[in-house]
């Protein structure tokens, strides 16, 4: 027997379904991820047409089904029209939506994740074009921190030795590993394991004595940027670090994005498909060092 329920949700994913419907993946505050059919929304005069668009926030009345729920009513509360007017902003919002999808759960409240994602969309919509790369990386770090997997960037995760990047050395590199949990020095043996660490190896996904697979490498300036962003201390309400936009050129932000992308993909074991357009979107941007703080 079907039952109805109410939820407030934002559309994260949409695809055609049947002749005139759409299948939506919705992040709701009350029920987490919900997959629901928007009946007839592809018809020209459908009331659900605009309400089934990406990144629209609706008050929903849903009917629970065996495998898919159905939207009975929807009242729009918020939308982000500015995102679709710029390819870089749209691609960035889709990128953050994928990270949100990979960590969202079904059948239980996701209030903090819902609030965080909507906050990032608001910040992104209000950003200037030069601020978009910062929005992407800052938002990515917030989502990783919310999932409990913010990378360690101030010390080697294997040797625990502090890292002080020599920004004047263009050839210096440090490894970046999801298995290790962040930065890994590329030379030197790991610190010997204690008896407790050896006993814990069987209980974790990545053994502490393993030869960690490095997903990418960071230059000294890229590591310096990550350290300035300070993932370990980042909070949902942390403001956009605008002064850093003038400090680091675009190529450094792009390098950090690439490292974080591979880190997240390795951890979630899922590709970030929208990342394919990131380099194309950001290439025409002016050098960020010319943007006043």
Swiss-Prot record:
Protein name per Swiss-Prot or TrEMBL: DNA repair protein RecO
Keyword annotations of the record: DNA damage, DNA recombination, DNA repair
Q: Which GO terms describe its biological process?
A: DNA recombination; double-strand break repair
Q: Tell me, in a sentence or two, what this protein's role is.
A: Involved in DNA repair and RecF pathway recombination.
Source domain of life: Bacteria
Q: Which GO terms describe its cellular component?
A: bacterial nucleoid
NCBIfam families in the record, alphabetically? reco
Q: Which family does it belong to?
A: Belongs to the RecO family.
**InterPro entries for this protein:** ARFGAP/RecO, DNA_rep/recomb_RecO_N, NA-bd_OB-fold, RecO, RecO_C
Pfam families reported in the protein's UniProt record:
RecO_C, RecO_N
| Disulphide bridges, residue numbers | none
């Amino acid at each position: 027997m079907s039952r109805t329920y109410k939820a407030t949700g934002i559309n994260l994913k949409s695809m055609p379904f049947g002749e005139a419907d759409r299948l939506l993946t919705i992040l709701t505050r009350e029920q987490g991820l919900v997959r629901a059919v928007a009946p007839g929304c592809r018809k020209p005069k459908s009331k659900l047409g605009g309400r089934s668009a990406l990144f629209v926030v609706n008050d929903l009345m849903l009917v629970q089904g065996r495998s898919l729920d159905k939207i009975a009513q929807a009242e729009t509360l918020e939308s982000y029209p500015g995102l679709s007017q710029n390819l870089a902003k749209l691609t960035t919002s889709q990128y953050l939506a994928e990270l949100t999808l990979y960590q969202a759960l079904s059948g239980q409240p996701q209030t903090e994740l819902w609030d965080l994602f909507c906050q990032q969309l608001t910040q992104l919509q209000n950003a200037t074009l030069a601020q978009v790369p910062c929005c992407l990386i800052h938002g990515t770090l917030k989502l990783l921190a919310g999932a409990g997997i913010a990378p360690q960037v101030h010390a080697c995760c294997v040797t625990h030795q502090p890292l002080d990047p020599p920004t004047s050395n263009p050839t210096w590199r440090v490894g970046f590993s999801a298995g290790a949990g962040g930065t890994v020095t590329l030379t030197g043996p790991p610190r010997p394991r204690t008896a407790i660490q050896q006993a814990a190896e069987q209980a974790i996904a990545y053994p502490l004595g393993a030869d960690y697979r490095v997903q990418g490498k960071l230059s000294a300036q890229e590591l310096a940027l990550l350290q300035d962003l300070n993932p370990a201390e980042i909070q949902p309400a942390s403001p956009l670090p605008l002064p850093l936009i003038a400090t680091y050129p675009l190529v450094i932000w792009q390098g950090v994005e690439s490292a974080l992308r591979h880190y997240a993909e390795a951890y979630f074991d899922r590709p970030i498909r929208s990342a394919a357009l990131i380099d194309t979107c950001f290439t025409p941007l002016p050098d960020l060092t010319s943007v006043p703080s």
